[in-house]
């Protein structure tokens, strides 16, 4: 697939790295020659210097023959205009990043579709929804629903009290008499393991399981932790993410929102009438003790500065907060944050990439999630008639070794996949796969 990316900033660079490993023909366009040199040193891409709001630059980038145009420049209006122009020049699909929720409302979306833009995405909104979802599943570090909620992916870290410690995967399978879940991956240190029946669980393992939706509570109990009802929460950072979280939850949860900027705190107090706004530095231990951080059920650090968020999250964990979530935009810091005990990491680039990645797939993908705690992806495919996946049982399909089928939904029936499972046309199939095998896996369902 020929893909043109407008913008060589953080988002554009991350997308370039993610998509380059899947055999795509990538071109990156930016007005900043230094940014182009940096992305060119990291990834095998064609770079074009120029402004994508100019037809001449779009033509030089080969937009007329591109399959997908992705506008991720820093200025919202530039993204919208670039996407419209690219579509008019012949791009098969054009998608754009925006910074306003207003553009995502149904009436507005129809206007943009008429203009030729296939999809608009607002990273801060996507990240806020991710946080809200995770606050409803406090024992999980990552949580995704598939097939309208019939199947779920649950990720959890094994505590010292976990009943799985020292046991093998087959031991866990034998106890799951009703076949309600399947372990699809174990992350140990920096290594992601697609487990065999003989693999043994160890303390601090990150376990990924596909589960029937009504059994997720049983699965997370295997972590050694219990779900916590969130009644009192503190948000650090009056960022777009922080404001969206507070706005959506303030009617149901007692929220304190902390921001060090006095002017911003004053404006937020006018906007969030049911949220207590506090003008303090979230890294100040004494100030946080006075604001009863230790009495919070959840702490969410979303200042936009990775270092600040990690330090504040460490403080919250030390004070005994049960659920701690931190926004970490520097991908190099994610493993550090996890190693010091931060429960869940949010990264706008990763959550947004999940929404964009499905546009690069030729197979019908209903849902795709780029995982934070692993380099892997988990996908929900809709099986086409006569596709290779329907020809054999799961054990004989010949899937890549670094992939595994977790579950199948057939109408109202839900199956946890085993070796003897037979996949039929129009089934919804949830697959866990490492990046290098994603495209090969997709071919089985096409």
What is each model feature region?
Residues 1-446:
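Cytosolic regulatory regions of ion transport systems
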């Amino acid at each position: 697939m020929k893909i043109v990316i407008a913008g060589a900033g953080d988002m554009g660079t991350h997308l370039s790295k993610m998509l380059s490993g899947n055999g795509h023909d990538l071109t990156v366009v930016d007005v900043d020659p230094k940014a182009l040199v940096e992305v060119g040193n990291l990834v095998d891409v064609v770079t074009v210097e120029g402004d994508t709001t100019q037809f001449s630059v779009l033509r030089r980038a080969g937009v007329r023959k591109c399959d997908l145009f992705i506008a991720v420049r820093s200025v919202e209006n530039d993204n919208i205009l670039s996407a419209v122009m690219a579509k008019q020049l012949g791009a098969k699909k054009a998608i754009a990043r925006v910074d306003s929720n207003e553009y995502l409302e149904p009436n507005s979306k129809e206007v943009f579709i008429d203009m030729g833009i296939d999809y608009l995405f607002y990273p801060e909104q996507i990240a806020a929804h991710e946080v809200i979802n995770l606050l409803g599943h406090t024992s999980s570090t990552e949580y995704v629903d598939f097939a309208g909620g019939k199947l779920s992916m649950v990720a959890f870290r094994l505590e010292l009290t976990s009943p799985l410690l020292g046991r093998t995967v087959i031991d866990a399978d034998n106890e799951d008499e009703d076949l309600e879940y399947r372990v699809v991956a174990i992350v140990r240190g920096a290594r992601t393991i697609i487990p065999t029946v003989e693999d043994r669980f160890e303390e601090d393992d990150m376990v990924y399981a596909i589960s029937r939706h009504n059994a997720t509570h049983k699965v997370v109990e295997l972590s050694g932790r219990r779900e916590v009802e969130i009644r009192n929460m503190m948000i650090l950072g009056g960022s777009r993410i922080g404001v969206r979280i507070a706005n959506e939850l303030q009617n149901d949860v007692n929220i304190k929102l902390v921001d060090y900027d006095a002017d911003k705190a004053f404006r937020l107090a006018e906007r969030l009438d049911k949220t207590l706004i506090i003008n303090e530095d979230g890294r100040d231990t004494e100030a946080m003790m006075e604001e009863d951080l230790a009495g919070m059920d959840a702490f969410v650090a979303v200042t936009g500065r990775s270092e600040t968020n990690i330090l504040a999250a460490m403080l919250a964990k030390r004070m005994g907060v049960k659920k701690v979530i931190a926004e970490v935009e520097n991908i190099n810091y994610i493993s550090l944050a996890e190693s010091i005990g931060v429960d869940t990491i949010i990264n706008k680039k990763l959550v947004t990439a999940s929404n964009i990645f499905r546009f690069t797939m030729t197979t019908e993908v209903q849902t795709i999630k780029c995982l934070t705690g692993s380099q892997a992806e988990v996908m929900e495919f809709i099986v086409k008639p006569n596709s290779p996946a329907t020809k054999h049982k799961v054990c004989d399909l010949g899937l890549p070794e670094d992939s595994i089928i977790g579950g199948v939904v057939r109408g109202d029936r839900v199956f946890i996949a085993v070796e003897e499972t037979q996949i039929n046309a129009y089934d919804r199939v949830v697959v866990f796969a490492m990046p290098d095998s994603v495209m090969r896996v997709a071919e089985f369902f096409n």
